Amino acid sequence: LATSILSYIKTNETHSNWIICEGGDDKIYLDTILPENKEYRILPVGGCGNVVKLFNLLLNPLLIDKKERKEFKGKILCIIDTDETKMNYKFENLKDMPISLRRLQVFKSNNEEVIKLLDVAKQGTIYEKTEIEDCLDPQIYYNSIKTVILSSQDSNIIDLFNNFELNREKKFSKISGDDSLLLPNGNEAYRRKNELVSFLEKPEIKMLVAKEYSQESQSTNITHALAIEIIDYFEESMITVS
């Protein structure tokens, strides 16, 4: 797979930009939030471990052979979640490489929520569990989970969800934790919130929500902060390899 991607990027006449992501639901979100006039090839590979493996397989030939880099006609962005368990990644100097491994991170800067794609080799002090579902438009995501939950025929989850309301002060779509998109109405809802989070984290539910989000987004004209981060990465200039 790595050989095929490298070969395609080198032989394609126009710039070929690739995004390697974890899962099929990630691909749906990326297809949804990125503008149609930006042509990205988005490839889900089934989990963080596979993204990192493919990154290494793509990186090694570029580290070894300058000619390989010189023939590159595009860039590759590998995106992973920030998991609860902090991982330590060590890479050689990747400055001006046409490939990068970044982790999603939502955090507060000057009391404002921001999204960054942080280089995993430069961990820094900012580290909080983040996945793509935390980086979306809050109103559209709320509408999407509401539609999926009400269609689920799970009366316990429906009753529980009806005891929450949208936190309109949120800039993004994080559900878990106290700083959440969902505001509980009463102690029982607060106490049982993890049941709702667990339901929404089921793979089949995540996929349904992603598809619903894509549908909901068609009638809006919103620029997603994550999309801006991704576009900025691909538009950053690199020093030409001589």
Task: Briefly describe each language-model feature range.
Residues 66-67, 144, 148, 169, ...:
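Residue-level signal for secondary-structure boundary elements
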